[in-house]
Protein backbone atom coordinates (compact mmCIF):
# COMPACT_ATOMS: atom_id res chain seq x y z
CA UNK A 1 0.00 0.00 0.00
CA UNK A 2 1.54 3.25 -1.12
CA UNK A 3 0.95 6.87 -2.10
CA UNK A 4 2.12 8.38 -5.40
CA UNK A 5 1.83 12.03 -6.49
CA UNK A 6 3.12 14.15 -9.35
CA UNK A 7 3.20 17.87 -10.07
CA UNK A 8 4.70 20.17 -12.69
CA UNK A 9 6.88 22.96 -11.23
CA UNK A 10 7.95 25.92 -13.35
CA UNK A 11 11.69 25.80 -13.92
CA UNK A 12 11.91 22.17 -12.82
CA UNK A 13 9.30 20.27 -14.77
CA UNK A 14 7.48 17.17 -13.58
CA UNK A 15 8.40 15.73 -10.18
CA UNK A 16 7.05 12.47 -8.77
CA UNK A 17 6.99 11.34 -5.13
CA UNK A 18 6.13 8.00 -3.57
CA UNK A 19 5.54 6.97 0.04
CA UNK A 20 6.27 3.23 0.00
CA UNK A 21 4.32 1.24 2.59
CA UNK A 22 5.04 -2.36 3.60
CA UNK A 23 4.03 -4.61 6.50
CA UNK A 24 7.65 -5.66 6.99
CA UNK A 25 10.90 -3.73 7.42
CA UNK A 26 12.62 -3.95 4.02
CA UNK A 27 16.28 -4.06 3.13
CA UNK A 28 16.78 -1.45 0.41
CA UNK A 29 19.58 -0.65 -2.00
CA UNK A 30 20.26 1.02 -5.35
CA UNK A 31 21.26 -0.55 -8.63
CA UNK A 32 22.55 0.91 -11.86
CA UNK A 33 22.53 -1.08 -15.07
CA UNK A 34 23.94 -0.26 -18.48
CA UNK A 35 21.59 -1.51 -21.18
CA UNK A 36 22.00 -1.46 -24.96
CA UNK A 37 20.53 2.01 -25.46
CA UNK A 38 20.22 3.48 -21.99
CA UNK A 39 21.38 3.32 -18.39
CA UNK A 40 18.88 2.69 -15.60
CA UNK A 41 18.87 3.54 -11.90
CA UNK A 42 16.65 1.47 -9.61
CA UNK A 43 15.41 1.80 -6.04
CA UNK A 44 15.60 -1.88 -5.04
CA UNK A 45 13.89 -4.02 -2.37
CA UNK A 46 16.45 -6.73 -1.61
CA UNK A 47 13.80 -9.00 -0.06
CA UNK A 48 11.23 -9.05 -2.88
CA UNK A 49 13.45 -7.75 -5.72
CA UNK A 50 10.77 -5.17 -6.52
CA UNK A 51 12.22 -2.09 -8.17
CA UNK A 52 11.29 1.22 -9.81
CA UNK A 53 13.20 4.30 -10.84
CA UNK A 54 14.48 6.16 -13.91
CA UNK A 55 16.71 5.97 -16.95
CA UNK A 56 19.27 8.41 -18.29
CA UNK A 57 16.77 9.68 -20.87
CA UNK A 58 14.86 11.11 -17.92
CA UNK A 59 11.91 8.70 -18.06
CA UNK A 60 10.66 7.75 -14.58
CA UNK A 61 8.23 5.13 -13.27
CA UNK A 62 6.52 5.07 -9.85
CA UNK A 63 3.71 2.66 -9.02
CA UNK A 64 1.16 1.95 -6.25
CA UNK A 65 -0.46 -1.46 -5.93
CA UNK A 66 -4.07 -2.30 -6.78
CA UNK A 67 -3.46 -6.03 -6.23
CA UNK A 68 -4.68 -6.19 -2.65
CA UNK A 69 -4.07 -9.90 -2.06
CA UNK A 70 -0.42 -9.56 -3.01
CA UNK A 71 -0.02 -6.28 -1.15
CA UNK A 72 -1.12 -7.72 2.19
CA UNK A 73 1.27 -10.69 2.15
CA UNK A 74 3.98 -10.38 4.76
CA UNK A 75 7.34 -11.23 3.25
CA UNK A 76 10.09 -12.00 5.74
CA UNK A 77 12.71 -13.90 3.73
CA UNK A 78 14.54 -13.16 0.51
CA UNK A 79 13.11 -14.83 -2.53
CA UNK A 80 14.87 -16.19 -5.60
CA UNK A 81 11.80 -15.31 -7.66
CA UNK A 82 11.91 -11.61 -8.59
CA UNK A 83 8.81 -9.46 -8.24
CA UNK A 84 6.73 -9.75 -11.42
CA UNK A 85 5.94 -6.04 -11.35
CA UNK A 86 9.61 -5.18 -10.88
CA UNK A 87 10.53 -7.24 -13.94
CA UNK A 88 7.95 -5.37 -16.02
CA UNK A 89 9.20 -1.97 -14.88
CA UNK A 90 12.83 -2.92 -15.55
CA UNK A 91 11.98 -4.01 -19.07
CA UNK A 92 10.04 -0.81 -19.79
CA UNK A 93 12.79 1.49 -18.51
CA UNK A 94 15.23 0.09 -21.07
CA UNK A 95 13.30 2.19 -23.60
CA UNK A 96 14.15 5.85 -24.12
CA UNK A 97 10.80 7.28 -25.28
CA UNK A 98 8.15 8.00 -22.66
CA UNK A 99 5.29 6.74 -24.83
CA UNK A 100 7.20 3.55 -25.58
CA UNK A 101 7.73 3.01 -21.84
CA UNK A 102 4.01 3.47 -21.21
CA UNK A 103 3.06 1.08 -24.02
CA UNK A 104 5.52 -1.51 -22.72
CA UNK A 105 3.87 -1.45 -19.30
CA UNK A 106 0.44 -1.84 -20.90
CA UNK A 107 1.57 -4.72 -23.14
CA UNK A 108 3.10 -6.43 -20.11
CA UNK A 109 -0.19 -5.90 -18.22
CA UNK A 110 1.27 -4.03 -15.26
CA UNK A 111 -1.37 -3.78 -12.51
CA UNK A 112 -1.60 -0.75 -10.24
CA UNK A 113 -1.67 3.02 -10.40
CA UNK A 114 1.49 4.00 -12.25
CA UNK A 115 3.10 7.35 -13.05
CA UNK A 116 5.23 7.48 -16.20
CA UNK A 117 6.88 10.89 -16.56
CA UNK A 118 9.86 12.88 -17.74
CA UNK A 119 10.66 16.59 -17.38
CA UNK A 120 8.09 17.64 -19.97
CA UNK A 121 5.26 15.08 -19.86
CA UNK A 122 3.38 12.89 -17.40
CA UNK A 123 1.03 9.95 -17.92
CA UNK A 124 -1.10 8.07 -15.39
CA UNK A 125 -1.88 4.41 -15.98
CA UNK A 126 -4.52 2.53 -13.97
CA UNK A 127 -4.45 -1.19 -14.68
CA UNK A 128 -6.08 -4.18 -13.04
CA UNK A 129 -7.46 -7.62 -13.72
CA UNK A 130 -11.21 -7.66 -14.28
CA UNK A 131 -13.34 -8.51 -11.20
CA UNK A 132 -13.23 -12.12 -10.09
CA UNK A 133 -9.60 -13.11 -10.07
CA UNK A 134 -5.96 -12.38 -10.70
CA UNK A 135 -4.11 -12.96 -13.98
CA UNK A 136 -6.68 -15.46 -15.26
CA UNK A 137 -9.02 -12.61 -16.17
CA UNK A 138 -8.87 -9.86 -18.75
CA UNK A 139 -6.49 -6.99 -18.08
CA UNK A 140 -8.30 -3.66 -18.03
CA UNK A 141 -6.58 -0.30 -18.10
CA UNK A 142 -6.99 3.39 -18.64
CA UNK A 143 -4.16 5.80 -19.40
CA UNK A 144 -4.30 9.57 -19.67
CA UNK A 145 -1.82 12.37 -20.16
CA UNK A 146 -1.75 14.74 -17.19
CA UNK A 147 -1.64 18.37 -18.26
CA UNK A 148 0.84 20.75 -16.67
CA UNK A 149 -1.88 22.71 -14.89
CA UNK A 150 -3.15 19.49 -13.29
CA UNK A 151 -1.86 17.46 -10.36
CA UNK A 152 -2.28 13.76 -9.71
CA UNK A 153 -2.44 11.55 -6.62
CA UNK A 154 -3.25 7.87 -6.22
CA UNK A 155 -3.26 5.31 -3.40
CA UNK A 156 -4.59 1.73 -3.43
CA UNK A 157 -8.09 1.88 -4.87
CA UNK A 158 -9.13 2.52 -8.42
CA UNK A 159 -10.41 5.97 -9.32
CA UNK A 160 -11.04 5.22 -12.99
CA UNK A 161 -11.36 1.45 -12.50
CA UNK A 162 -13.92 1.58 -9.72
CA UNK A 163 -13.75 -2.12 -8.82
CA UNK A 164 -9.98 -2.24 -8.43
CA UNK A 165 -8.02 -2.20 -5.19
CA UNK A 166 -9.42 -1.92 -1.68
CA UNK A 167 -13.22 -1.88 -1.50
CA UNK A 168 -15.76 -1.50 1.28
CA UNK A 169 -17.67 -4.52 2.52
CA UNK A 170 -15.54 -7.46 1.37
CA UNK A 171 -14.51 -8.08 4.99
CA UNK A 172 -13.64 -5.94 8.00
CA UNK A 173 -9.91 -5.86 7.23
CA UNK A 174 -10.42 -4.83 3.62
CA UNK A 175 -12.99 -2.22 4.66
CA UNK A 176 -10.43 -0.69 7.03
CA UNK A 177 -7.86 -0.72 4.23
CA UNK A 178 -10.43 0.92 1.95
CA UNK A 179 -10.96 3.69 4.51
CA UNK A 180 -7.19 4.15 4.81
CA UNK A 181 -6.72 4.31 1.04
CA UNK A 182 -9.38 6.99 0.63
CA UNK A 183 -8.12 9.04 3.58
CA UNK A 184 -4.55 8.89 2.26
CA UNK A 185 -5.76 9.95 -1.19
CA UNK A 186 -7.55 13.01 0.23
CA UNK A 187 -4.41 14.02 2.11
CA UNK A 188 -2.09 13.34 -0.83
CA UNK A 189 -4.27 15.36 -3.20
CA UNK A 190 -4.32 18.24 -0.71
CA UNK A 191 -0.53 18.13 -0.40
CA UNK A 192 0.18 17.98 -4.14
CA UNK A 193 -2.25 20.85 -4.77
CA UNK A 194 -0.71 22.97 -1.99
CA UNK A 195 3.02 22.36 -2.50
CA UNK A 196 4.93 25.18 -4.20
CA UNK A 197 8.29 23.39 -4.36
CA UNK A 198 9.48 19.80 -4.72
CA UNK A 199 10.82 19.98 -1.15
CA UNK A 200 7.37 20.85 0.17
CA UNK A 201 5.85 18.06 -1.90
CA UNK A 202 7.94 15.32 -0.30
CA UNK A 203 8.13 16.87 3.18
CA UNK A 204 4.40 17.50 3.57
CA UNK A 205 3.68 13.85 2.79
CA UNK A 206 5.33 13.01 6.14
CA UNK A 207 2.97 15.07 8.28
CA UNK A 208 0.26 13.87 10.67
CA UNK A 209 -3.08 15.27 9.54
CA UNK A 210 -5.38 12.97 11.55
CA UNK A 211 -4.77 11.20 14.86
CA UNK A 212 -4.76 7.67 13.47
CA UNK A 213 -1.41 7.10 11.74
CA UNK A 214 -2.94 4.44 9.47
CA UNK A 215 -5.09 7.16 7.86
CA UNK A 216 -2.18 9.49 7.07
CA UNK A 217 -0.14 9.65 3.88
CA UNK A 218 2.84 8.60 5.98
CA UNK A 219 2.05 5.72 8.30
CA UNK A 220 4.05 4.73 11.37
CA UNK A 221 3.71 1.37 13.13
CA UNK A 222 5.50 -0.55 15.87
CA UNK A 223 3.43 -3.73 15.74
CA UNK A 224 4.33 -6.61 13.45
CA UNK A 225 2.29 -6.96 10.25
CA UNK A 226 0.98 -3.39 10.43
CA UNK A 227 1.47 -1.24 7.36
CA UNK A 228 4.13 1.42 7.76
CA UNK A 229 5.86 3.87 5.43
CA UNK A 230 9.29 2.39 4.92
CA UNK A 231 10.78 5.09 2.68
CA UNK A 232 10.02 8.08 0.50
CA UNK A 233 11.22 8.32 -3.08
CA UNK A 234 11.30 11.51 -5.19
CA UNK A 235 12.34 11.47 -8.85
CA UNK A 236 13.38 14.72 -10.57
CA UNK A 237 13.91 14.08 -14.30
CA UNK A 238 15.44 17.49 -15.01
CA UNK A 239 18.36 16.74 -12.71
CA UNK A 240 18.33 12.95 -13.30
CA UNK A 241 18.26 12.64 -9.52
CA UNK A 242 16.63 10.13 -7.19
CA UNK A 243 16.01 11.48 -3.68
CA UNK A 244 15.39 8.86 -0.98
CA UNK A 245 14.32 9.33 2.63
CA UNK A 246 14.61 6.11 4.69
CA UNK A 247 11.92 5.94 7.38
CA UNK A 248 11.32 2.40 8.66
CA UNK A 249 13.80 0.42 6.59
CA UNK A 250 17.37 -0.75 6.35
CA UNK A 251 19.28 0.81 3.49
CA UNK A 252 22.64 -0.14 1.98
CA UNK A 253 24.59 1.99 -0.48
CA UNK A 254 28.01 2.90 -1.79
CA UNK A 255 27.99 6.60 -2.66
CA UNK A 256 31.33 6.38 -4.43
CA UNK A 257 29.99 3.70 -6.73
CA UNK A 258 26.67 5.49 -7.25
CA UNK A 259 27.84 9.08 -7.65
CA UNK A 260 31.61 8.97 -8.01
CA UNK A 261 32.21 8.06 -11.64
CA UNK A 262 33.48 10.84 -13.91
CA UNK A 263 30.87 10.00 -16.53
CA UNK A 264 28.03 9.69 -14.01
CA UNK A 265 24.65 10.72 -15.44
CA UNK A 266 22.17 9.88 -12.69
CA UNK A 267 22.44 10.73 -9.03
CA UNK A 268 21.22 9.42 -5.67
CA UNK A 269 20.67 11.82 -2.77
CA UNK A 270 19.67 10.77 0.76
CA UNK A 271 17.32 13.02 2.74
CA UNK A 272 17.29 13.38 6.51
CA UNK A 273 14.25 12.26 8.49
CA UNK A 274 14.47 15.38 10.68
CA UNK A 275 11.32 16.65 8.96
CA UNK A 276 9.37 13.95 10.82
CA UNK A 277 10.02 15.79 14.08
CA UNK A 278 9.38 19.39 13.06
CA UNK A 279 6.17 21.26 12.30
CA UNK A 280 7.51 24.26 10.45
CA UNK A 281 5.69 25.48 7.35
CA UNK A 282 3.09 22.70 7.39
CA UNK A 283 0.03 23.01 5.15
CA UNK A 284 -3.38 23.44 6.74
CA UNK A 285 -5.36 20.28 7.52
CA UNK A 286 -7.88 19.61 4.75
CA UNK A 287 -11.38 20.46 5.97
CA UNK A 288 -12.88 17.42 4.22
CA UNK A 289 -10.94 15.10 6.55
CA UNK A 290 -12.97 16.04 9.61
CA UNK A 291 -15.29 13.05 9.21
CA UNK A 292 -12.68 10.39 8.52
CA UNK A 293 -12.25 9.12 12.08
CA UNK A 294 -15.91 9.38 13.07
What function would you assign to each model-found segment?
Residues 1-294:
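N-terminal nucleophile
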